């Protein structure tokens, strides 16, 4: 039958047993095509290469050069121009400003590439409050600050799927009188009694108590206060990973407490104040805010630019 190797009976039977499994293999779907959105990595790679000798530099001077047109860069440019400094230039690596507050479009629908909501700021962030009034998200009525409901999203109450059921809020459920509920309430008391925190952080000042918290991990601080409950620590670890990208064993106690004490506090299930304020959000996420910061800066904004060096000199950089 041919000159190839013979197929013995044992090999044939083993192969035949596996034939039905080939029908279970998922076929490749050519309609699902992946792609790369977000950072322009090829521009970042240029930093590894020397500048071609044929490229002749063009010198320009500006009173202020801001490297990066994320929210911080755009806000800084806005404040400079508000203070009368008109010669402000922004250099941005990507094709669009916004940093992690940019958006993408899929089939004509906008979606965020990063930050996707804005909590209503506290009184300490009065610059942000002023700007939100300026863009129409806030207004005053009868001496009260009122948010435009068209841009608000109220947190859904059933958000945690635990033991086969949905539960209110994000905390794992706990029976009244249980050790877990006691741990929740104890942590809420400690957050309420913590040293002053604020956003922005410098509005709260810095004290020896803050330095002590900053010198220990959040896990060590919880241990010191006897907070070993697994449900509480799971939630706090989740919060730290969500905001800081690291868990209780790496994040400082200052950062862990700042997450709660600078904003909405911590509320045990059933607490009358457990409902948080609604947040501002949009289909494109915080790119909605980026657009309103960037539009007045279009003539000053230079996208697709790689900054290779910033060198300090006697009277400038």
Language model features: what each stretch is:
Residues 81-104:
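Glycine-rich FAD pyrophosphate-binding loop
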Residues 198-316:
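Active-site/ligand-binding neighborhood in enzyme catalytic cores
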Residues 2-63:
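Extreme N-terminal leader/targeting segments of oxidoreductases
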Residues 109-193:
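Dinucleotide-binding Rossmann-like beta1-alpha1 core, especially the glycine-rich loop
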Residues 62-89:
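N-terminal Rossmann-like FAD-binding beta1-loop-alpha1 element of flavoenzymes
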Residues 78, 115-118, 206-208:
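Second-shell loop/turn segments in exported
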Residues 75, 123, 127-130, 217, ...:
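Extracytoplasmic/secreted proteins, especially bacterial periplasmic and envelope-associated proteins
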């Amino acid at each position: 039958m041919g000159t190839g190797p013979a197929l013995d009976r044992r090999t044939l039977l083993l192969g035949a047993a596996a034939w039905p499994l080939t029908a279970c293999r998922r076929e490749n779907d050519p309609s699902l095509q992946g792609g790369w959105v977000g950072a322009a990595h090829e521009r970042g790679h240029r930093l590894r290469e020397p500048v071609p000798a044929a490229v002749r530099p063009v010198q320009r001077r500006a009173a202020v050069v801001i490297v990066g047109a994320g929210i911080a860069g755009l806000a800084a440019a806005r404040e400079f121009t508000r203070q009368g400094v008109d010669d402000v230039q922004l250099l941005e690596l990507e094709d669009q400003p916004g940093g992690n507050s940019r958006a993408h479009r899929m089939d004509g629908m906008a979606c965020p590439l990063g930050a996707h909501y804005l909590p209503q700021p506290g009184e300490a962030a009065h610059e942000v409050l002023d700007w939100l009034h300026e863009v129409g998200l806030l207004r005053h009525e009868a001496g009260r600050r009122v948010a435009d409901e068209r841009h608000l999203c109220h947190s859904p109450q059933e958000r945690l799927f635990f033991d086969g059921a949905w539960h209110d809020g994000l905390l794992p459920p706990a029976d009244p009188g249980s050790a877990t509920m006691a741990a929740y309430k104890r942590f809420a008391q400690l957050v309420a009694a913590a040293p002053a925190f604020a956003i922005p952080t410098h509005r709260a000042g810095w004290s020896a108590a803050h330095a002590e918290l900053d010198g220990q991990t959040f896990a060590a601080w919880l241990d010191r206060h006897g907070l070993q409950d697994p449900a509480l620590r799971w939630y706090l670890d989740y919060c730290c990973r969500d905001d800081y990208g690291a868990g209780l064993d790496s994040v400082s106690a200052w950062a862990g407490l700042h997450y709660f004490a600078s904003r909405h506090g911590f509320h045990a299930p059933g607490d009358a104040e457990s409902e948080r304020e609604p947040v501002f959000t949009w289909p494109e996420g915080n790119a909605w805010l980026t657009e309103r910061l960037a539009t007045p800066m279009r003539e000053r904004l230079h996208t697709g630019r790689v900054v290779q060096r910033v060198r300090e000199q006697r009277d400038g950089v």
